[in-house]
Amino acid sequence: YFYTASSGIENFPSYVSFGLVDDVQISYCDSRTNENIPKQDWMDELSSEHPTYWMEETETCRDKQQILKGNLEIAKKRFSQTEGVHVFQQMYGCEWDEETGEVKGYDQFGYDGEDLITLDSNTQQWVTPRTQTVNTANRWNNDRTIKEHEEKFYLTQTCVEWLKKYVNY
């Protein structure tokens, strides 16, 4: 999944998100529509099996929109940038090797086109090349809730369960 919050760009949504499976777009949401919509016909089959799927995805879109817009404002302050065009992004998801069964989760954030903070999938530690986000990485590394839910449970279990459903269509 890709999430983007931006500021200072006229005639462009301040938030855009979309999901991909095997490099094929499956969903799209932005701050203008505030609704997550399917981008593949086979997603309708998924809806019949999981009737609340799109309602839940829309809720996630709206929640992530608020979170990313907040993160964008925090980043602008940390980098002492209040005006101009700025972009805050998150890319997260999972990979599953059907042959070996190997699972790999990833979660990374960027600001203005540069890496900001990334989950190292080997060490399960947050790392950052930027001094402005060292405190955030340290705080996340010491937060049991983030470590247990986000890193272990979601990225290596829930995400993979959904990925397996998607690739079956």
Residue ranges and their predicted role:
Residues Y1-Y169:
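Extracellular/lumenal regions of secretory-pathway proteins
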